[in-house]
Amino acid sequence: LSSTVGLAWRLERGALSAWVIAFAILGLVVGGVAGDVGSFLNTSSGQDVLRRLGGEKSLVDAYLAAELGILGVVIAAYGVHAALRLRTEEDSRRAEEVLATGVTRVQWVGSFILVAAAGTVCLALAVGLSSGAARAVQTGQVSDLFDLLAGALVQLPAVWLVIAVVAAAYGIGSRAALIGWGALVAFLLLGEIGPLLELPEWIIELSPFAHVPELPGTTLTVAPLV
């Protein structure tokens, strides 16, 4: 398994490095403009939208929670993209060469899924640390760094569920793995846009992103993450 993980990592590390840099920059922007969010949303309708996305808390916390929630979906998109490298390798017949060496299909698939999941952790850390650092510099409160880091990391269980959908669909067939994109779009519509459309709660809760604690600004609870 270790050798196949190494192969999956070598194939993915270039793309992941670019994603990490992009997310670090995004985090700096998100955290850097947090203090000025009130001036950007000086209409009552604009502030209401952010509060509904981020929960009933202060405007800045609502903005940060909403941005991290959106970035959580983008992290999931990376996870789907990385996991679908399985399909690329199989279509190019490079997978056959690896499997011919005695590596089991479970080992091969598991290695790519593991690397995809690890990549999402890297992205969450990048955006959490950079946004938290930018916000902490603004406020002078080190706690803001940890709050935003937590807000990024709590997105991961929902992200991993999306990757699990890809893995399960791939077990049916390589083309079926594309179901992962459909699942992600459905979860996005339900979890992020559902509250704005005032859909029934039970429909919204079909999305794993609807169960993610809205940090910063609320108390972290473990139950929704399990």
Task: Name the predicted role of every residue range.
Residues 1, 13, 17, 21, ...:
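Terminal transmembrane helical anchor/hairpin motif
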Residues 2-12, 97:
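A short amphipathic helical element positioned immediately N-terminal to and/or at the very start
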Residues 62-86:
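Long, hydrophobic alpha-helical segments
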Residues 80-99:
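Transmembrane helix boundary and interhelical loop/hinge segments in multi-pass membrane proteins
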Residues 104-117, 223:
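Membrane-interface alpha-helices at helix entry/exit sites of multi-pass transporters
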Residues 114-167:
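Secretory targeting signals
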Residues 156-189:
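A structural motif at transmembrane helix-loop-helix junctions in multipass membrane proteins
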